[in-house]
């Protein structure tokens, strides 16, 4: 009952735009050392929050920021109450922890992935399992939040870039820089919505000010839809000197990929991933625009966004 009353009072204050100095502003952050988490920590501190972040490795404290060594699998001693809990790491791990933890926080914001939709009908069993775990984690998180009177929101990024730590566009940039060329199969023109890490961190803060986001999951794509090949062209154009983009027939590309697999390389590029290059993987971001003013930037990459 106490948690439910706290959640209601918090939502009323946030909806009214009240940010009184005596209003507690403590955040607990998981995944704060990751590419999204680093930007989120900076945003919270700039906004005057006191933050406790969790990390497996020891980290130095900073003004307004303390680090707690641990992870989501160990025993939890509540250092709350917190005004908000953020998760920028694996959603399934966080959902299990949240179900079991006796944490007092009226607001929960967790990052998931659009893979919950993209991979649910994949030909690859491992990818279908990823989608299943994400779907079940979202449901578990929302149910646990409702049971304790908290307001939970899930944010589903598309193709993330901007910190030089992503597994797709940064990998493309680095491979192309080393070789001077990047090869794509003909027909790799499925639409994409690359999204900058800063826009994701900003979104996590924005939802706190909008109680209507409680109980909802939002797709967070970038501000522009473009073909896969055009996306790669822009990545290459941002590099110095710009590597060349080479389009080859799809059968030739598949043969080269099979040889790479045979020597233990490019394992992440399976048949399903290759097929998705031709498929439109775009999502409706209008609900996020409407509910909390989401305004992502168009895709204009620069070299530093890939850590180069």
Region spans (language model):
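NAD(P)H-binding glycine-rich loop region in Rossmannoid oxidoreductase-like domains
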Residues: 65-106, 110, 114-125
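Conserved SDR Rossmann-fold cofactor-binding beta-strand/turn motif
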Residues: 156-157, 161
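Mid/C-terminal beta-alpha module of Rossmann-like enzyme folds, strongest
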Residues: 207-269, 285, 290-308
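N-terminal Rossmann NAD(P)H-binding glycine-rich loop of SDR-like oxidoreductase domains
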Residues: 28-45
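Substrate-positioning beta->alpha
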Residues: 166-171, 186-208, 215-219
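Alpha-helical membrane-targeting segments
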Residues: 171-194, 242-281
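Active-site Tyr-X1-5-Lys
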Residues: 129-153
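N-terminal Rossmann-fold cofactor-binding loop
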Residues: 54-58
């Amino acid at each position: 009952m106490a948690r439910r009353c706290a959640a209601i009072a918090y939502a009323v204050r946030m909806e009214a735009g009240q940010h009184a100095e005596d209003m507690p502003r403590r955040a607990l952050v998981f995944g704060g050392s990751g590419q999204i988490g680093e930007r989120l920590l900076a945003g919270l501190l700039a906004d005057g929050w006191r933050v406790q972040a969790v990390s497996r490795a020891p980290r130095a404290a900073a003004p307004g920021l303390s680090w707690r060594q641990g992870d989501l699998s160990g025993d939890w001693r509540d250092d709350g109450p917190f005004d908000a809990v953020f998760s920028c790491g694996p959603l399934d791990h966080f959902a299990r922890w949240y179900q079991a933890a006796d944490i007092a926080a009226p607001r929960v914001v967790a990052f998931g992935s659009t893979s919950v939709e993209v991979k649910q009908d994949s030909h690859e069993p491992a990818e279908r399992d990823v989608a299943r775990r994400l779907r079940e984690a979202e449901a578990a998180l929302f149910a646990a939040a409702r049971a304790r009177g908290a307001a939970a929101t899930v944010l589903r990024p598309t193709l993330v870039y901007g910190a030089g730590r992503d597994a797709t566009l940064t990998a493309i940039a680095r491979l192309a820089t080393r070789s001077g060329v990047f090869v794509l199969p003909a027909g790799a023109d499925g639409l994409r919505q690359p999204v900058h890490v800063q826009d994701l961190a900003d979104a996590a803060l924005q939802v706190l000010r909008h109680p209507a986001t409680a109980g909802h999951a939002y797709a967070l794509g970038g501000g522009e839809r473009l073909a896969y090949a055009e996306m790669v062209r822009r990545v290459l154009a941002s590099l110095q000197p710009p590597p060349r983009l080479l389009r080859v027939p799809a059968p030739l590309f598949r043969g080269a990929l099979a040889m790479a697999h045979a020597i233990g390389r490019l394992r992440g590029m399976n048949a399903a991933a290759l097929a998705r290059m031709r498929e439109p993987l775009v999502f409706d971001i209008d609900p996020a625009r409407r509910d909390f003013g989401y305004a992502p930037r168009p895709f204009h990459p620069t070299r530093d966004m890939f850590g180069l």
